[in-house]
């Protein structure tokens, strides 16, 4: 019999927002879209030119499968990771792996920790947070998942004391989507010490580290090598690094040899590697166009300041000051449009329907991104939030 074999209600928050947005457009509304975190416009010209040259190359390797290596772009993964770090990683202590972006490997991490054969407890930063790690955990029948506590009270940084006994894998995401919080060297050091002492594998999704606006922002890779017993890995991507590289699907992992070896085994059975010409373009920009990358970072920082000031003037309350990326996170008003607000979803859907402002509701919070030109949208945004007449308490 034909029909879905999946349980009902499996769509995540992004699917809900896209559906509501589509319905509003169908009604003829003009939208002020601050929802999905995808940069506008093209990738950096330096990346596009290098990718174009690679596509036109006669080198057979540039047009072939790359698998878990990158023969067309020699030493890509080490070079890509190293360009994100303040100092080189110790030779012989780590291994590298090219990836087609971070999202495709999130579901492989529990498998690399043995969840196909035995029970594994996985902790994630998904409440609030990017939902895909939790979504993948739900697909793995031997995984027990829990979300680490993240809120304004702990500044969206969990503590080692929050980690449940028998946890086998922790999947962190710093800088954090959606709060914009960063991890510091000292914070990572305390977490690494705990994981090493309790035999917990540790992974960090560092997708937004290239857009850090705070000098304290650190990568796991800066600290983890201090702990020889720690099994760890970290992933980086070109998606937001080179302007709009979201469709390029290029990145790299680094980590302890044991964890990367397990990831190579699992990943090697699920894909044939990234698209080499796009990798050639990404590494050319990363190594040769830091000015262009810095310009995008400065643009987002300027837009963050503009949007937070505008929304605060309209009565909205920040959950935390963003220190990286291009997101702002807000406390949900208890009143708007002359009535009580039941939830973040209620407020977001009502804002879309009443004003055309599109955000993303994450649990008790609301996320508004600055990928769009918020300066051009500012008058309309201010009018929309003033129309809402938000209140708290």
Short names for language-model regions:
Residues 2-3, 7-101, 288, 391-393:
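N-terminal small-domain helix-loop-helix segment of the aminotransferase-like
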Residues 17, 34, 51, 80, ...:
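Generic structural signal for small/hydrophobic residues in well-ordered secondary structure
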Residues 24-27, 140, 197-198, 314, ...:
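Helix C-cap/helix->beta junction micro-motif
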Residues 51, 225-301, 305-311:
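Conserved core segment of the aminotransferase class I/II
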């Amino acid at each position: 019999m034909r029909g879905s074999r999946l349980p009902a209600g499996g769509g995540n928050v992004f699917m809900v927002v896209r559906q509501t947005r589509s319905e509003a457009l169908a009604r003829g509304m003009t939208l002020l879209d601050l929802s999905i975190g995808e940069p506008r416009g093209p990738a950096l010209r330096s990346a596009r030119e290098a990718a174009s040259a690679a596509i036109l190359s006669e080198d057979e390797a540039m047009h072939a499968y790359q698998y878990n290596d990158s023969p067309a772009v020699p030493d890509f993964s080490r070079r890509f990771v190293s360009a994100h770090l303040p100092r080189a990683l110790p030779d012989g202590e780590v291994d590298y792996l090219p990836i087609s972006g971070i999202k495709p490997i999130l579901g492989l991490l529990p498998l690399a920790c043995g969840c196909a054969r035995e029970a594994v407890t996985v902790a994630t930063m998904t409440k609030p947070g990017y939902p895909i790690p939790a979504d993948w955990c739900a697909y793995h029948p031997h995984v027990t998942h829990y979300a680490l506590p993240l809120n304004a009270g702990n500044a969206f940084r969990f503590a080692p004391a929050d980690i449940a006994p028998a946890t086998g894998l922790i999947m962190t995401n710093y800088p954090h989507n959606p709060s914009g919080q960063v991890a510091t060297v000292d914070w990572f050091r305390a977490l690494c010490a705990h994981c090493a002492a309790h035999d917990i594998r540790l992974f960090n999704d560092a997708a937004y580290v290239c857009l850090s606006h705070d000098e304290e922002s650190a990568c796991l890779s800066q600290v983890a090598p201090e702990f020889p017993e720690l099994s760890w890995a970290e992933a980086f991507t070109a998606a937001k690094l080179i302007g709009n590289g979201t469709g390029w699907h290029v990145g790299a992992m680094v980590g302890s040899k044991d964890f990367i070896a397990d990831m190579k085994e699992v990943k090697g059975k699920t894909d044939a590697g990234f698209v080499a010409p796009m990798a050639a373009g990404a590494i050319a920009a990363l190594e040769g166009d830091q000015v262009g990358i810095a310009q995008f970072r400065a643009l987002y920082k300027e837009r963050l300041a503009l949007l937070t000031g505008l929304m605060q003037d309209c009565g909205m309350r920040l959950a935390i000051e963003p220190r990286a990326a291009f997101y702002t996170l807000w406390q949900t008003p208890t009143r708007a449009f002359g009535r009580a607000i039941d939830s973040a979803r209620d407020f977001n859907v009502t804002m879309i329907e009443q004003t055309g402002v599109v955000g993303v509701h994450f649990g008790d919070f609301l996320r508004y991104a600055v990928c769009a030109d918020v300066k051009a949208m500012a008058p309309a945004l201010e009018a929309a939030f003033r129309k809402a007449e938000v209140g708290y308490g």
